[in-house]
Amino acid sequence: MEPIKRFTNSVSEGNLWIYVLSLAKEVEIQEETISRLIFEKFGFLPNELMIKTVLFRLKKDGYVSKEKLAGKKSYKTTEKGLKELDSMKSYCSNLIQKL
């Protein structure tokens, strides 16, 4: 596999939490629409099972809260999640400057 392909996989499907926290930072997102939203905004279509796993872990660790929106499961990024997202952005900025 070419290096760019490995890199693309690691920063997309390998780090779904970044995309979930980003999408849910301003509005609640329904679980069933997350794949489509990620595809529309970030250009890749993640596996549904991976999304469920990431949501479970993010909720368990307090990075997202689980809500009901129109009777369906939805998620919103918590303050803890926003801080984690800001830390990731800072890390990426520093890394890009070093490259």
Predicted regions and their residues:
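Basic, amphipathic "hinge/linker" alpha-helix immediately C-terminal to the N-terminal HTH DNA-binding motif
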Residues: A70-M88
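Short, Lys/Arg-enriched N-terminal segment that forms or immediately precedes the first helix
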Residues: M1-N9
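Short, leucine-enriched amphipathic alpha-helices that occur as contiguous helical runs
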Residues: E13-V20, E48
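DNA-recognition alpha helix
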Residues: E32-G43
